[in-house]
Amino acid sequence: AAKYFTHMVLKLEDKCRHIGRNLTLEATYSKPSAELINLWNHQVEMSPRYTARAELISEHEPHRAVMLVMADRRITDTMYHSADEFLDDLRVVQRSLAACGAVRAAYGPVQTIIWQVESFGFHMVEMEFRQHSVVHARALKDIHENGIHGDLQPMTREVIDTFRAIGSIQKRYGKKMAHRYIISFTKSAQHVADVFELAHLSF
């Protein structure tokens, strides 16, 4: 999970920075929208260091400056919490570019990165988990008899560890990266309920 996340974030950073460097549109001739100005003001509050650096190399080029700060936001204290948050900022830039007449930039490179984020998010792949319904039933029986912290069977421990791993992945990289769980040989609603109960007990 970490490998795919790191790979994707670095690729998006490179692409975002490349787009930003090529957005040489002076505010005098390509007036930024109020929405873009608000985004820039938010970036200034969030990181004076990043915005000062972007402004230094993008004087009077607000679209460029905003994109360069977006590219820098992969450090822990400033990084985007989700791909949707990153998409929101990209769309602000796109709408501003389109409104000021820079249609080729808005629906060319900016649209391309938007499609990429919509398709793959920050995760690139979606992990799938699968377990037999009988294993779930046996694990629950074991937990009910011995307690979640009791002397449990190795398979029960494996089931619990799996749910905890899913939770950890979702918390760190987003729910979309690990949101598919398949119950093999499901024959009743109880088999689905077992999974929810195990997930609840695991945390």
Predicted regions mapped to residue ranges:
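A short acidic (Asp/Glu
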Residues: 138, 189-197
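"Short basic amphipathic alpha-helical interaction patches in structured regions
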Residues: 129-130, 196-198
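Active-site-proximal loop/turn and secondary-structure-junction residues that shape catalytic pockets
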Residues: 130-133, 185-189
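Extended, charge-enriched "interface" segments that sit outside catalytic cores
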Residues: 13-180
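Non-catalytic terminal/interface segments that mediate subunit docking, oligomerization
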Residues: 167, 199-203
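Extended active-site and interfacial segments that coordinate phosphate-rich ligands
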Residues: 1-12
